[in-house]
Amino acid sequence: XRDGYLVDDXNCTFFCG
């Protein structure tokens, strides 16, 4: 993600918003 809090796997895997 872009705004990933924990994992930023491009498209957000865990916490993103």
Swiss-Prot record:
One of its GO terms (molecular function) is toxin activity. GO terms for cellular component: extracellular region. Expressed by the venom gland. Its main location: secreted. Residues 2-17 form the LCN-type CS-alpha/beta domain. Alpha toxins bind voltage-independently at site-3 of sodium channels (Nav) and inhibit the inactivation of the activated channels, thereby blocking neuronal transmission. The fraction to which this protein belongs exhibits low toxicity and induces transient paralysis in all insects tested (the crickets A.domesticus). Belongs to the long (4 C-C) scorpion toxin superfamily. Sodium channel inhibitor family. Alpha subfamily. Has the structural arrangement of an alpha-helix connected to antiparallel beta-sheets by disulfide bonds (CS-alpha/beta). This is Toxin Bl-2. It comes from Buthacus leptochelys (Egyptian fat-tailed scorpion). The lineage of its organism: Eukaryota, Metazoa, Ecdysozoa, Arthropoda, Chelicerata.
